[in-house]
C-alpha cells in the first residue's frame, strides 16, 4: 500500500486543522511552499453556555481567518461539540468521579482531531490532513510510524500515542522538523497575525477558570478526612477529585504541632474510605513507584510482546525518557522501571518508546510502591 503522503504535492489536497495558533498557521504556510493544494479547517469543540467564551473560540476563529486570508487559502469551519461531549468530556467526568486524574487532550486527539476532523476532511475531498503538532512520521513499508518531534521541549508524541498508524499515514506534521523559535520566526517573516500569540495552556473547556470551580458544576463534591501515613486525621478535603498524586498546593494544612517545616504532599487517594493520605517532603518514600499496571492500551502499530521488551516510557508530558521493561501478564500490561518513578498517577497516561519511535501507550491503572508500606 502506497502512503497517501507520497503522492505528487501538486496533485495532493491537504486540509490543515487551523486552531488560531502559530503552529497550525506556519504548518499551512509551509505546505503551500511545498506545493500542496492547501485549505484550512477550524474546529469548534465546545459550546460555551455563559457568554464568557472561556475557550476563546471567537478570537481563535478570527485569528485563523486572518492567517488564511494572508496566505490566500479557504477556511472551512466545523462544529464537533457533540462528538467532543460524547467521546471526550463524558469520559473525563467518569474518570474524575472514579477518583482518577484523566488527560482529555489524548482522547481529543484520537476521537476528534484524528477521527471526526479526518473523516470530515476526507468528505470534503481531501487526500490528507495536517496539524501543527510537534511530531514526525516515517513510512516503513506498509506501516507509518509516529516519531518524536525534533524539538525536545515541544515534542507532543505523548499526546498522540493513541492515534493509529493508518490515521498517521493520512496526516502531515510540517513543524515537527522545526524548533519553536524557528516557527515563530517564519510566522513573523510572513506577517502572520499569530506570530506573537501565546501558546494555549490547560484544558480548552476550562480556560482561565479555577479547576475546582469548573468541576463542581458537573460533579458533586464529597468532603472527607486528610490523614497522615500513620492514620492521624490532620484536616479535611473538599473532594478527592480535586487532588492528584504529588500535589502540594491547596491542601490547607499548616501550623500543626510537631509537624516540622517541610511541605505536605498528596501521597495516596483512598477511594474506599474517601480519605486523602498526605506526607511531608518532596522525597517521601510513598511518592515513588517501581512499576505500574496499564490498561486501555493503544499501539500506533502492532507490536510483539510475546516476551518482555526493554523500552523507554514517560508517565507525564515532558518527562525525560525512563528505562523500563514492558511485559504482558495475566492481569494486563506491566512496566517495571530501572529507577524509582515519582508521582505515578492513576488515570494519567504512560507512553512507550523505542528510541525516537512512539509505540503507543495506555492509562495507568495502579502503581507499585518502590519500598514496602507499613
Swiss-Prot record:
Disulfide bond sites: 108-204
Catalytic activity: S-sulfanyl-L-cysteinyl-[protein] + uridine(34) in tRNA + AH2 + ATP = 2-thiouridine(34) in tRNA + L-cysteinyl-[protein] + A + AMP + diphosphate + H(+)
Annotated site, Interaction with tRNA, chain positions: 133, 348
One Gene Ontology biological process: tRNA wobble position uridine thiolation
EC numbers: 2.8.1.13
Residues annotated as catalytic: 108, 204
Region (Interaction with tRNA): 154-156, 316-317
Region called Interaction with target base in tRNA, residue ranges: 103-105
Top EC group: transferase
Keyword list, A-Z: ATP-binding, Cytoplasm, Disulfide bond, Nucleotide-binding, RNA-binding, Transferase, tRNA processing, tRNA-binding
Entry GO MF terms: ATP binding; tRNA binding; tRNA-uridine 2-sulfurtransferase activity
Residues reported in the UniProt entry to bind ATP: 17-24, 43, 132
GO cellular component: cytoplasm
Subcellular location: Cytoplasm
PANTHER family according to UniProt: MITOCHONDRIAL TRNA-SPECIFIC 2-THIOURIDYLASE 1, TRNA 5-METHYLAMINOMETHYL-2-THIOURIDYLATE -METHYLTRANSFERASE
Role: Catalyzes the 2-thiolation of uridine at the wobble position (U34) of tRNA, leading to the formation of s(2)U34.
Family recorded in the similarity comment: Belongs to the MnmA/TRMU family.
Record's protein name: tRNA-specific 2-thiouridylase MnmA
Protein source organism: Pseudomonas putida (strain GB-1)
Gene: mnmA
